[in-house]
Swiss-Prot record:
EamA domain ranges (all copies): 12-133, 150-274
Gene Ontology, cellular component aspect: plasma membrane
InterPro entries with a match to the protein in the record: Alkyne_AA_exporter, EamA_dom
Family label: Belongs to the EamA transporter family.
Domain of life: Archaea
Record keyword Transport present: yes
Compartments in which it is found: Cell membrane
Annotated TM spans: 5-25, 31-51, 63-83, 89-109, 119-139, 142-162, 168-188, 200-220, 231-251, 253-273
Membrane topology per record: Multi-pass membrane protein
Keyword Hydrolase (UniProt): no
Name under which the protein is recorded: Uncharacterized transporter AF_0266
Length: 276
């Protein structure tokens, strides 16, 4: 029972992250949101680094490079994308990450792609076409978030070799701290621009503590209790949370195009990640 509570909280934290970002980009720059988010999260991740297993010096450059993609590139482009598209659509596009992991693994790690997975990939990208309304802002926003999706896939694909040496929490904590180094120079101006808006401050704190720190801890706790291939299916609930939260909290419209396109994306991803 405990693992399902943890999963429900994790999915909720990650789903609401897109809503918090969409609210925050009304007042802060995309880089400011990312720098503030990780200033908070890294304070907690630093404790894990201090208490946990040390990353070997020879592995630090790879962890740093992975972190650049998984933190700086991923979050800045996601925040940029949400300037132009709704939080719900952003979460649907991000959910394509397993498909890019599959493609990158096939290219660089020589992992096999089955016929059913090819069908899933086609269905998922058809879904993206459906939700891509014919406007410059919408297409541009989706393209920006797609960069984040590819960055997340790079982080996951090329981080596989390090998971044989380090546990996921240790690796993630170091990648978060090292990967956000390019964001640190923007922190002083970001703090000044934050002001005294309690709703905005609450959104940033939520992103740093709950969506980032507790989100990852919860996910890895669940992975210890559940098979990874089955666990990944539950991540399909994240866009559902984001779409509903965006509609309820930010009055984002749930159009037929959005619902139909999202449904196709999630169906395609399910076909890709399900265990045969």
């Amino acid at each position: 029972m405990k693992k399902w509570i943890v999963l429900a909280l994790t999915v909720t934290f990650w789903g609401l992250a897109f809503t918090a970002i969409k609210y925050s980009v009304r007042f802060l720059s995309p880089i400011a949101i990312a720098s503030l988010r990780f200033a908070i999260a890294n304070t907690l991740f630093a404790v894990i680094i201090i208490l946990g297993k040390r990353i070997k010096w020879k592995d630090l450059p790879k962890v740093f490079a992975l972190g650049i993609f998984g933190v700086s590139v991923y979050h800045v482009f996601l925040n940029l994308g949400e300037v132009y598209i709704s939080s719900g659509v952003a979460s649907v596009v991000i959910s394509l990450a397993p498909i890019f992991v599959l493609i990158l693994s096939a290219i660089f790690l020589r992992e096999r792609i089955t016929y059913s997975k090819v069908v899933g990939i086609i269905i998922a990208f058809l879904g993206v076409v459906v939700i891509s309304e014919p406007s410059y802002a919408n297409i541009y926003g989706i393209a920006l978030v797609m960069v984040s999706t590819v960055a997340a896939a790079i982080y996951t694909t090329f981080g596989k070799s390090l998971l044989s040496k380090y546990n996921p929490i240790t690796l993630t904590s170091n990648a978060m701290v090292l990967g956000s180094i390019p964001l640190y120079p923007f922190l002083p101006d970001s703090i000044r621009s934050l002001g005294g808006d309690l709703n905005l401050i609450g959104s940033i704190v939520f992103l740093g503590i709950f969506s980032t720190f507790f989100g990852y801890l919860g996910w890895y706790y669940f992975l210890e209790k559940e098979e990874a291939s089955r666990a990944s299916v539950f991540l399909l609930a994240i866009p559902v949370v984001s779409l509903l939260a965006g509609n309820i909290l930010l009055a984002e419209p749930l159009t037929l195009r959005t619902v139909a396109g999202s449904g196709l994306v999630l169906l395609g991803i399910y076909i890709v990640v399900r265990k045969r």
